[in-house]
Amino acid sequence: MLSCFWFFSKHISSALMSLPRVLHRFTAPQCLASRYPLGPLLASPRRLLASVASSQDSTRPSRVRQNFHPDSEAAINRQINLELYASYVYLSMAYYFSRDDVALYNFSKYFLRQSLEEREHAEKLMKLQNQRGGRICLQDIKKPDKDDWECGLRAMECALLLEKNVNQSLLDLHTLASEKGDPHLCDFLETHYLHEQVKSIKELGDHVHNLVTMGAPAAGLAEYLFDKHTLGSESKH
């Protein structure tokens, strides 16, 4: 038994002593050695994945691209970002109105529907970008300007301004598409976006007018009744 232990100990010690010489002779593959000059140790999985991703040629030409100007492609990416920002703002509003100290749950449901709708708008533009042979470049989404939306009237006024800004951006994109001779993009915007934006602006304008007429925000009961009867009836349809 002791002789077996002595035999294995001797060979293990010999292997450990020779390990530095083995590592010294190891040469990393050229693709790694040039990227990671810290020695023969292999790169971490995260760094290796990043290097592989960065080495991919994301600018290779599309086989389906036709009559799609680079300016239109860039403008669509900006519009995607704006639609996601609008969704982010509406999401903030939705969960503000479901707080225990606000408790206007139909306001919350209304703004949550708006948030989902804006996200769908962004996804539809992403699908268009791929259909036309463009490349999606997502950007940082700006956080909402506030976390406390004060009252229903203030939130509706902010939503109205937001929809007007989104609509103006869509109109600018439509003008650009027309200037670049892109009837498909013009038709896409007219069919899926511009008419819907006009309806949303009118709806929000009506809500703001009715809240003001009812005495909001000074009359606290006004927003409660608006939440219960106006927005409550809308959520049932």
UniProtKB/Swiss-Prot annotation:
Protein task: Catalyzes the oxidation of ferrous iron(II) to ferric iron(III) and stores iron in a soluble, non-toxic, readily available form. Important for iron homeostasis. Iron is taken up in the ferrous form and deposited as ferric hydroxides after oxidation.
Protein name: Ferritin, mitochondrial
Keyword presence, Mitochondrion: yes
Known partners and oligomeric status: Homooligomer of 24 subunits. The functional molecule is roughly spherical and contains a central cavity into which the polymeric mineral iron core is deposited.
Catalytic activity, as annotated: 4 Fe(2+) + O2 + 4 H(+) = 4 Fe(3+) + 2 H2O
Enzyme Commission number, as recorded: 1.16.3.1
Matches recorded under InterPro entries: Ferritin, Ferritin-like, Ferritin-like_diiron, Ferritin-like_SF, Ferritin_CS, Ferritin_DPS_dom
Keyword annotations: Iron, Iron storage, Metal-binding, Mitochondrion, Oxidoreductase, Transit peptide
Source superkingdom: Eukaryota
UniProt: Fe cation 2 binding residues: E118, E163, Q197
BP GO annotations: intracellular iron ion homeostasis; iron ion transport; positive regulation of cell population proliferation
Protein family per UniProt: Belongs to the ferritin family.
Domain Ferritin-like diiron: 66-215
Binding site for Fe cation 1: E83, E118, H121
Keyword Metal-binding annotated: yes
Leading EC class: oxidoreductase
GO molecular function ontology, one term from the record: ferric iron binding
Residue span of the annotated presequence: 1-49
Compartment list: Mitochondrion
GO cellular-component term (any): mitochondrion
